[in-house]
């Protein structure tokens, strides 16, 4: 079996018993399965939620207000407990774990991004299992430093280390769809997804699982992003951790989001799954064709609308006229300058394009989805 690099994301509800306490027995099973995978010669990185839930076992805090302060206290206390439980479970398999806490802000600067990658590469080199969680103590929506849930963090890390496979372990058996039978409607697992379509998204239940931040839609969207980056991704039942090994052995489990075949350069990976976007550009049909079909840079004459305030060298998202996101790139001018060019062009009656021929986003600093 060819050696693979694997990311396993474990959801809060997978780690909890019905009473809300951590399921130590299940964590032990997970450690055993990961140890088995590693014995096959594969490298494994774990993304684990559950710090707030672990904190509830040790702290008596009034959470009625659901305040940021109470969540941060629980995360601070619970993260120490959570990593201790993991360390004890993996020690039984003679495996060392490392704790890594990250925020969205850690991925913004490419230098930091590369430092994270180098650390993870060295941990894997020395046969250590990195266990990563979002740093809930400093990652707040107010500071725009949070991922929102660990689903997106798992995709970013899988992209960062060049993972072959990404597993989302949840309390569902996979992405479910309704199917009409003689006995009535029933739910069946969607076994394979080739493209993330509106039909696929309609299968997602809109509710968020109790105890967690994300729901099925979050996982499906994250899986869709991962497969577009060339990573085979699975959503499956984490209460039966043997399923990961079953997939590794070629069996069908859960929902498989089939990886697209294209290769992505390191810099483009950072553009796609690292940098923090500061604004949005809406482009016309001609510019869309120039980018997608002719592989050209984006010029000012193709921009119809500028959203947000961004500076030269900031990252911006690109949308077409129908509101479909086309990609992301590094702007070679500030929003104020670009708006002024568009305004001047609208005011001129000569028919001559007065906008700069300098690219707004150079092809080398562009990632298209």
Which role fits each region the language model picked out?
Residues 1-64, 68-96, 100-369:
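C-terminal catalytic "cap/lid" subdomain
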